Amino acid sequence: MSSLVINSKIWGEMFGTREMSDIFSDKKTIQYYLDVEAALARVQSRLGIIPKTCGLEISKVAKTDWIDWELLEKRTSIVGYPILPLVEQLSLKVKKNLGQYCHWGATTQDIMDTADVLQIRDALSILLSDLVGIKKALKKLVKKYINTPMSGRTHLQHALPTSFGYKCSTWLSGCLLYTSDAADEKYR
């Protein structure tokens, strides 16, 4: 049984979508690490830092379908992080004795931080897409309820009357602000 609510079969869907959970799953996280290792090798090959064929050979096998997950889990618990055990497996998978060039010149933190950024980028795309839908729904609510009275609230008590449409417009303004900022961040 999971000790985390986000991994719970009962509660998990209440706190996140399957799409978002997939981005941060173990399998996808390892794939991000492999993607970074492959990209690093391709660039280093192109620059002549490692043999020219290494980038392609490492990229060919940078997939999670061959990973020995039990070994990765066991070695990670010993080492304290998954990069060394992953690179050990990756270097054995690369043909033509080119495995020695896996992870060339990189640190564990380089790989993990870069993969984290890629995960966050992909998660941000989902959030922005969701916010577009929320904005559309809020715009409809603003128009529909612009003249529907309700009690205003301040300091956890009733205040001057307002409209539900106006209340929705304040939520909408927040969404507009955040989507603008998030879209700007996405392309920086």
Language model: regions and residue ranges:
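A helix-coil-helix interface module used to build multimeric assemblies
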Residues: 2-180
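Single conserved hydrophobic/aromatic residue that forms the stacking wall/gate
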Residues: 178-188
